């Protein structure tokens, strides 16, 4: 039985699983083969339980494929494999998320190597982490499940799980909440951890002040000696060449010290214009996860949780009514609920659907005006560079059929029209055709990064 057995399994799993799943759950595993037993070591209990629940059959199936009746037994452990039994996990260059680290990268230094600790005073760190944003009050749904799971692992194992962690998605979807949740999680495990949260513009402002005050070395020392650096809206580095230069070196210093970096953006790293390619490449060294607009069930759960936090009884049918009509992001949902609560407090009236219609009259009218089937068809046609007439035609080529399915799925998601009504609007198609289109797009969003990106981009455009 070859020691490359786990490497063979990794290669097959990489082919069979979506890239994000492989990076998040399979790549962190370490393997040890001994006495006809393959031990897989997970970095924490959360990963172990998830892998055993979701991928046990896949792994056992591969072991049987490769070894037949001689397949080893499978055992799961939390921790690291014994140092004496080193089994390389590198499958291909594409599996590795970053170039090989220097041999000296073994432990996070308390200060950068160039810092003269005896000559420099102890730095004072401003955390800026909001204690109100935790994992406990983050509402999990299909749209953000992977992002939350990755953030949770980083909080449990900073510098070791996914570094850097890059979260991207539209405005108001929970990226900032997760940044703060990670910061709070790290500090809960280690009270004296040096965790710094900031908007990217603050980094730029600090650098400018340091240059003006001839204090650039102190600036470098400050940012390169944190345990975790959490930067929001990294896209604001665009076209700021001096800031990008300094962040490039800060990024490298932190990574070499096993210090955690988490970044957020409103778009995929490679799509950030005005940012150097060498930075965009580094953004993807660890794990990149999208946060999509919340689906209906998650929107309802967010409203119910927010109401509960405010000691407000929100009937389920009212939460469903609001969630069905406001779809773009969490911030919009919470803002609408705050308005409903304020109106109820001022008037003393019960929160009913009729009351919500009145309290959110202008917001609901604007939403219905913005998102119509006609508007969806025009937006999708423009996005895919085809004609609206193509969407309504009988043509079945993929270049037309896929955009048509996308438009139907968006119509179901963003409007209150029934399936037959949507079918009529697409050239008199049957409601079963619309249902098939919706299911197909949902399936492709799980399997294809491009379709997932297209759906998110179109939702963002139509909801803005």
Curated annotation (Swiss-Prot):
Region Disordered, annotated ranges: 98-117
One biological process term in Gene Ontology: regulation of DNA replication
SMART domains listed in its UniProt record: AAA, Bac_DnaA_C
Sequence segments annotated as region (Domain III, AAA+ region): 128-344
Compartments, as annotated in UniProt: Cytoplasm
Record region (Domain I, interacts with DnaA modulators): 1-82
Membership in a protein family: Belongs to the DnaA family.
Name assigned to this protein: Chromosomal replication initiator protein DnaA
Organism from which the protein derives: Serratia marcescens
């Amino acid at each position: 039985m070859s020691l490359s057995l786990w490497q063979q399994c990794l290669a097959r799993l990489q082919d069979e699983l979506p890239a994000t799943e492989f990076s998040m759950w399979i790549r962190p595993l370490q393997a040890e083969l001994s006495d006809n037993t393959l031990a897989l070591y997970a970095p924490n209990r959360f990963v172990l339980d998830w892998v055993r629940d979701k991928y046990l059959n896949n792994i056992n199936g591969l072991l049987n494929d490769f070894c037949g009746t001689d397949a080893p037994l499978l055992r799961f452990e939390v921790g690291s494999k014994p140092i004496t039994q080193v089994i390389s996990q590198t499958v291909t260059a594409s599996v590795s998320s970053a170039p090989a680290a220097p041999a000296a990268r073994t432990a996070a230094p308390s200060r950068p190597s160039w810092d003269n600790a005896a000559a420099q005073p102890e730095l004072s760190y401003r955390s800026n982490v909001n204690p109100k944003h935790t994992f406990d009050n983050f509402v999990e749904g299909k749209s953000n499940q992977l992002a939350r799971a990755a953030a949770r692992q980083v909080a449990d194992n900073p510098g070791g799980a996914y570094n850097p962690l890059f979260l991207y998605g539209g405005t108001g979807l929970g990226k900032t909440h997760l940044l703060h949740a990670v910061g709070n999680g790290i500090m809960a495990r280690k009270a004296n951890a040096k965790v710094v949260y900031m908007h990217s513009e603050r980094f730029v402002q600090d650098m400018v002040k340091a240059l003006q005050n001839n204090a650039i070395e102190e600036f470098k020392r400050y940012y390169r000696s944190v345990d975790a650096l959490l930067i929001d809206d990294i896209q604001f580095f665009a076209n700021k060449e001096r800031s990008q230069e300094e962040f490039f070196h800060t990024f490298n210093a932190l990574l070499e010290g096993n210090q955690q970096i988490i970044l957020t953006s409103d778009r995929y790293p490679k799509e950030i214009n005005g940012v150097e390619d060498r930075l965009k490449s580094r953004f993807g060294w660890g794990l990149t996860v999208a946060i999509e607009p919340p689906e209906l069930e998650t929107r309802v759960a967010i409203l119910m949780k927010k109401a509960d936090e405010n000691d407000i009884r929100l009937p389920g049918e009212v939460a469903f009514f609001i969630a069905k009509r406001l779809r773009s992001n969490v911030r919009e949902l919470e803002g609408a609920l705050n308005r409903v609560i304020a109106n109820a407090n001022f008037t003393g009236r019960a929160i009913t659907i009729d009351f919500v219609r009145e309290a959110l009259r202008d917001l609901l009218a604007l939403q219905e005006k913005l998102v119509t089937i006609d508007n969806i068809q025009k937006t999708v046609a423009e996005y895919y560079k085809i004609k609206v007439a193509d969407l309504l035609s009988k043509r079945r080529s993929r270049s037309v059929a896929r955009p048509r399915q996308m438009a139907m799925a968006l119509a179901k998601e963003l409007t209150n029209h029934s399936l037959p009504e949507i079918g009529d609007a697409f050239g008199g198609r049957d409601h079963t055709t619309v249902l098939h289109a919706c299911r197909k797009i949902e399936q492709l969003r799980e399997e294809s990064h491009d379709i997932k990106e297209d759906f998110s981009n179109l939702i963002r455009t139509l909801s803005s």
